[in-house]
Amino acid sequence: MTEELTTVRDACARTLENTARTLHLGASGTEFVAAFRAMTDHWGAARPHDLPLSDVSPDGSPVEYAVDLGGLAPALQFAMEPLTAGVPARDPLAARAIMPLLAGRYGADATRWSALADRLLPDDAHGPHVSMYGAEVRAGAPIRFKAWFYLNVTGPDGAFNLLYSALERMGTTHLWPVVQAHVHRAGEDVPFLLSLDLSDDPAARVKVYFRHFAADVEEVAAVLKAYPGFEPGEVRAFCKVMMGGRRRFSDQPAVTCVSLLDAQTFDRTAATLYVPLWTYAEHDGEVRQRVHRTLAAWPEALYRYDSVLAGIAHRGLDAGTGIHNYISWQPGRTRPRMKVYLSPEMHDVTPPPLGVSQQHHLSGQTTARGRTE
């Protein structure tokens, strides 16, 4: 648990500064941290317990850091939830205010966001959260911004219909078959996030994230088998290593995402697997050992991971879980692409399955159904 001697904004900005320095991002890292400060200015002098519990990290912290573990040019990413002290996280006002800031100051493209905002950022949201925003940077490259919308804002059974409505508003209903094909188990393979790259680049992505409730590793591998490069044996092996030999995602569902446009062109890898790390290990030291096993063949990736982890962790790794959120996996031409997602852990160690902000809302089996049936 972080000592509440500084504000959430300052504490997380310092961690980003240190991580950017570790990754040798130079001036790009400085601009990146400045963007984080601008996007979190509305937090003001709030300390961790002044803000409502967030869904960004499982312990309720409103920030998550992510580092690409492959490639010569490392990428650093953050995600944040627009929150206001004393106001429920589902309130959309703070979320609506971020997009004009990004468009006006950084030239982010608001076209798709504007088509969706009144539908996906409602005043009477059913779920506990409505949106997240994030940014990613590499040395010498411009900052790329993105937004995530929660798909349960009209209720847990409305996710598919809301997603179809979102595609309709963007003029992309021709992509609906991609969503349908990704659902292998009706009522258990459930879309819960829609993300947009906030760019007018033709390659800007529209991604849908799915939770796969009570799936075993074979069922997850079967979902991903449809996408080039996802060999079922490799997916199963990766999951088993990161889950300590377990075969079923019994406590915390696996997550996959599909980039809808890429799924039709195959120019880029269309899918990503995310394995949750805080529920299938005794402590973060055990998670670190599993990451080491996965990265053993790539010493430069292992060094990058250890260096970043050392700068973010502020307690002994054997004290519990909660520093590691997820690890993602995609096939690559010469090696898999992996990214590790880490928490500032501003609240308690060892968060529960689904995270502290979702444990009651999602405590039962999700049974979202709709147009896929």
UniProtKB/Swiss-Prot annotation:
Family matches, as InterPro entries? Aro_prenylTrfase (IPR033964), Aro_prenylTrfase_DMATS (IPR017795)
Give the UniProt keywords, A-Z: Transferase
Which regions span the lipid bilayer?
A: none
* Amino acids binding L-tryptophan: D55, V56, E64, R211, Y326
Give the matching CDD domains: PT-Tnase (cd13930)
Q: What happens when the gene is disrupted?
A: Eliminates cyclomarin and cyclomarazine production and significantly reduces the levels of desprenylcyclomarin C. Accepts exogenous analogs of N-(1,1-dimethylallyl)-tryptophan including N-(1-propargyl)-tryptophan to produce the corresponding cyclomarin and cyclomarazine derivatives.
- EC numbers, comma separated: 2.5.1.-
Which residues of this protein are catalytic? E64
Pfam families in alphabetical order: Trp_DMAT
Annotated GO biological process: alkaloid metabolic process
Protein's name in the database? Dimethylallyltryptophan synthase CymD
* Species of origin: Salinispora arenicola (strain CNS-205)
| Organismal lineage | Bacteria, Bacillati, Actinomycetota, Actinomycetes, Micromonosporales
State the gene name recorded for this protein.
cymD
